Amino acid sequence: MRHQKEQYYRKKSGSLLSKVANTVVTLCMTVALMWGLQACSNVSALRFVQLSDIHFLENGSNNTFKMLGETPRLLDDAISQINEQKDVDFVMITGDLIDKPFEKELRAVLPHVQKLNYPWYFAFGNHDRCVGGYLTTNVYMEMLKEANSDFKFDNSYYSFVPKKGYRVIVLDDIITNEVTSQGYVDEKQLKWLKKELDKAKNDTALIFMHVPIIEPFASPNHRLKNASQLMGLIESYKNPIGVFQGHYHAARVVQHDNVLYVSTPALASYPDAFRLITVQNYKDKTVFELKWFETREKTIQKMAKLLVIASSIYTGEENERDGIYEIKK
């Protein structure tokens, strides 16, 4: 009888130890899983919208491939869609906010842009200023600062840090001393850019400009005159770099090793679209996720499509609209 009791207690004790061991293992696995999930959730992510070539005209007409008579409606719809998105860090307008470089047009468009729920910034386009006109760089910048408490810059090219691990660099590649649709980045700005890229060697650099370094399609009258020089400077750095451009009203994405070149189409002409970009910095890579938004003003979009030749040039390939691109570190 005593022997049977000893066996019973040994079995019970062994069973209890087994349960304790299983509980400890389960607890350890749970902690490890939670730590892993937390590590993933702590990835440094940045979300921003690129909105380009709005060509706002208060009383325009649709007599070109641009839907100038509809730009207020197109802009209001885009702003409404942007405001519906969550956790957007900023909105960047990459040039041609207005179609004609007049003060009254800038004053007319600013109340629309002020409806954005997120900080917004601006890069100059060739339609934003004119040679010898009243709407000079200084006047334009002062009007932007008056309308936008987040815009505190004195120069037409500038930089800021939106979040740890990222540096935003805005270039002004517009020629202001001659009437042209071409672009150029002068030596003074190139030296400044080098200093900014030096500061971002351990970060992800995000460069915004109007005239693209890589053309979505060939157009000698719209190209960046010193594109190869600018590309050489940017690609001499090995950290992840995204370059976001407009001007050609077309979608194009090209990756050169650690540099991703993204051209975004116009809001004012087909496909009447903009982008939401999410950038995530991991230890061994940086991931760019591009998401495409078209206008909900479908009647305007259909009309705009009829006004362009070879509409697929402007929409690009599917992965140039919605795509995920990785840059290894």
Residue ranges and their predicted role:
Residues Q50-L74, C130-F151, T176-V185, E215-F217, ...:
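Acidic/histidine-rich helix-loop elements
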